């Protein structure tokens, strides 16, 4: 069966990639006159434009993994995490990938739909401070007396107060400069700020692509300085989860299989991703995927316990860190935000 990818434009300023699987129902071999069940249609949302970090989902499509789970998956792009969560909450999307910390903020609203995460792809959040050594920043402590650029809507800055306190940095000693996400990398490359806050696999790779020498860049990953946060997770519409639990389980199995393929052969995975991107370059996207695998996906915790789940004690610590900046109506516990009932057994989630 041929897997077809269709590109369409949304009515917003953000491009929409439709990853559509063309599925044909047929006869099961060896079973006379028994038709296969019709595939379950799933609307899946990414909260940002496609890049190599999304390889597990692309490979689940291009390599027939969704098809083998009898799923017909169409993928669209939201304008950000808030939009992606809203689509799942309303039912216009069945599943989405969003930052689990953005989900916590959403769920803290009094009238929030009971959307939960069912799978964590990024065991460590990709939050980082990216600086130039030529500006005098080589370690986190060097930020005192410096200017840190923060893009509008960059929620990784929610963890900055906890990170600073944990590492003995006075918040008042670091000036925060806010600006549009479009000028984050240009501001740092031009020396208008000393460092910028962002995602390690996005901002760091983008700066190298802009010609900033790799040996002049310092990438200070929040996780290396005590941040306990989990990152990107899959969330599901409550009604869809209740009505089609086997489809949710099949989706997760396909994503796990796609993740294994991306880890086994990142170069080939990037080739698949590039066929679905606008303007991606192979070297940049390969560097991006390798960084994500090493820093965010294939962590020691994942090697021990398998991909996709969370540790309730670590989750509680991450909530405490987030609460140093975010004022919750009620601090969430793991079961408020995460439902592990759709996950395969841990032995089926081991990745090495």
Residue ranges: model-predicted function:
Residues 59, 127-137, 229-247, 303:
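A bilobed periplasmic-binding-protein/Venus flytrap-type ligand-binding module shared by bacterial periplasmic
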Residues 35-190, 194-201, 220-222, 227:
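Short, glycine-/small- and polar/acidic-enriched structural segments
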Residues 13-28:
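Bacterial N-terminal signal peptides
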Residues 315-352:
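Conserved C-terminal helix/tail region of periplasmic/extracytoplasmic solute-binding proteins
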Residues 243-325:
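Secondary-structure end/capping motifs
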């Amino acid at each position: 069966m041929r897997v077809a990818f269709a590109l369409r434009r949304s009515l917003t300023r953000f491009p929409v990639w439709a990853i559509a699987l063309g599925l044909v129902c047929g006869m099961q071999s060896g079973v006379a006159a028994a038709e296969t069940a019709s595939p379950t249609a799933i609307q899946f949302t990414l909260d940002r434009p496609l890049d190599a970090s999304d390889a597990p989902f692309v490979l689940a499509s291009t390599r027939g993994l969704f098809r083998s789970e009898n799923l017909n998956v169409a993928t669209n792009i939201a304008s950000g995490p808030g939009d992606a969560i809203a689509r799942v909450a309303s039912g216009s999307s069945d599943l989405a990938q969003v930052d689990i910390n953005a989900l916590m903020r959403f769920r803290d609203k009094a009238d929030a739909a009971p959307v939960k995460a069912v799978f964590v792809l990024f065991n460590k959040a990709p939050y980082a401070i990216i600086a130039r050594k030529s500006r005098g920043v080589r370690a986190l402590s060097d930020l005192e007396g410096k200017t840190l650029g923060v893009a509008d809507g960059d929620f990784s800055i929610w963890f900055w107060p906890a990170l600073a306190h944990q590492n003995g940095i006075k918040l008042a000693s670091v000036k925060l400069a806010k600006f549009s996400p479009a000028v984050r990398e240009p501001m740092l490359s031009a020396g208008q700020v000393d460092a910028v806050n962002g995602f390690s696999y996005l901002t760091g790779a983008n700066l190298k692509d802009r010609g900033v020498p790799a040996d002049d860049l310092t990438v200070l990953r929040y996780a290396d300085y005590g941040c306990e946060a989990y990152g990107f997770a899959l969330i599901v519409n409550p009604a869809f989860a209740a009505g089609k639990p086997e489809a949710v389980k099949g989706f997760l199995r396909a994503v796990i299989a796609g993740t294994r393929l991306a880890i086994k052969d990142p170069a080939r995975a990037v080739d698949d991703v590039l066929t679905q991107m606008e303007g991606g370059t192979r070297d940049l996207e390969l560097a991006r995927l390798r960084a994500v695998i090493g820093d965010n996906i294939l962590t020691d915790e994942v090697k021990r316990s398998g991909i996709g789940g969370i540790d309730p004690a670590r989750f509680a610590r991450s909530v405490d860190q987030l609460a140093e900046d975010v004022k919750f109506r009620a601090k969430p516990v793991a079961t408020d935000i995460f439902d592990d009932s759709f996950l395969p057994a841990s032995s089926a989630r081991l990745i090495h």
